[in-house]
Amino acid sequence: MLNKLIERENLSFEESYELFNMLLNESEMRIAAYLVALQTKGVTADEIAGFAKAMRDNAVKIDLGEVTDTCGTGGDGSKTINVSTAVSIILSCFTKVAKHGNVSITSKSGSANVYEALGCKIPETPEDAKKSMDKTNFAFLFAPKYHPALKKIMPVRNELKVKTIFNILGPLANPANPKYQILGVNSPDLLDNVAIALSKVGGIKKALVLYGDGLDELTPNGTSKITEYNGKFETYEVTPKDFGLDYAKIMPCESPDESAKRLIDVFSGKLNEDRNFILMNAAAALYTSENASDFLDGVEIAKEAIESGKVLKKLEEIRNV
């Protein structure tokens, strides 16, 4: 298959699935060759889907029932608060959330970093994650604990210091096999391919793949692009006005501790620039998980959860598991 990639020929879903499993037993030199050849050619939806399905199949198994995930590819280079973590906690007031996360890639506040800064403990085992889900409707799945098969590949990625298909795979490889997913990407070119790949991995009922003018979140100060999958695909653009919200500045964030403090400020009802950023993305997640009829409804539901104290109470429940 290496020659095929060098000749810039695309792989099928089946070939990509096979290649992932081959890489687990290859030398570091050949792993690097495959990853660079694939990246140079440009990855397709079938290749992303094949790798993601193989990554899930090689993951530590966990059954949490019908869950939603909110995460992004990262790698957008932004210094923002960790919106997806805020959204996942709000969403868990209404439905089961399995947050598949890791430490920071390029931001100042990766989801695992912020989760711990909020005073929450990352579950050590699938049994601990199930306990958290049963008690709180929320479980944090720390990616390295569920993908031990990647131990051989990760050093190669780090040594290469270039983007590879693995920069895309994290959100597609949640071992809990979410039925609903909101997934941010760091380039508009990835929208359709990632949405198609997500549909091919299997099990997804509804998903939003989104890009927010340089962010892997919906942006509160410009236009965002969304590819929605609900048995069929639809691509459209949105602004804060579609959510009934005013435009808001994106304020830089310098650390996980700062991100955690600012999330708690919003959860406490503070009216600031972060609030609309979080409300917009929470509304999209509520809509995706079928807990809101549309984006406007989602904003009102999220607002009520914050203003009634439900979200702060939920955070306290998660802390105390």
Swiss-Prot record:
Q: Known Pfam families for this protein?
A: Glycos_trans_3N, Glycos_transf_3
For the ligand (anthranilate 1), the binding residues are: G72, N102
Reaction(s) catalysed by this chain, per the record, are:
N-(5-phospho-beta-D-ribosyl)anthranilate + diphosphate = 5-phospho-alpha-D-ribose 1-diphosphate + anthranilate
Q: Name one GO cellular component term.
A: cytosol
- Its annotated pathway? Amino-acid biosynthesis; L-tryptophan biosynthesis; L-tryptophan from chorismate: step 2/5
Q: Which SUPFAM superfamilies match?
A: Nucleoside phosphorylase/phosphoribosyltransferase catalytic domain (SSF52418), Nucleoside phosphorylase/phosphoribosyltransferase N-terminal domain (SSF47648)
Tell me which InterPro entries the record gives: Anthranilate_Pribosyl_Tfrase, Glycosyl_Trfase_fam3, Glycosyl_Trfase_fam3_N_dom, Glycosyl_Trfase_fam3_N_dom_sf, Nuc_phospho_transferase
Report keywords, A-Z.
Amino-acid biosynthesis, Aromatic amino acid biosynthesis, Glycosyltransferase, Magnesium, Metal-binding, Transferase, Tryptophan biosynthesis
> Binding of anthranilate 2: at which residues?
R157
Q: Which GO terms describe its biological process?
A: L-tryptophan biosynthetic process
EC assignment: the record states 2.4.2.18
Q: Where does 5-phospho-alpha-D-ribose 1-diphosphate bind?
A: 72, 75-76, 80, 82-85, 99-107, 111
Binding-site list for Mg(2+) 2:
D216, E217
Q: Name one GO molecular function term.
A: anthranilate phosphoribosyltransferase activity
Instruction: Tell me how this protein assembles.
Output: Homodimer.
The family note in this entry says: Belongs to the anthranilate phosphoribosyltransferase family.
Q: Which HAMAP family match?
A: TrpD
Summary of the function given for this chain in its UniProt record = Catalyzes the transfer of the phosphoribosyl group of 5-phosphorylribose-1-pyrophosphate (PRPP) to anthranilate to yield N-(5'-phosphoribosyl)-anthranilate (PRA).
**NCBIfam families the UniProt entry points to:** trpD (TIGR01245)
Q: What name goes with this protein?
A: Anthranilate phosphoribosyltransferase
Source organism per entry reads Methanococcus maripaludis (strain C7 / ATCC BAA-1331)
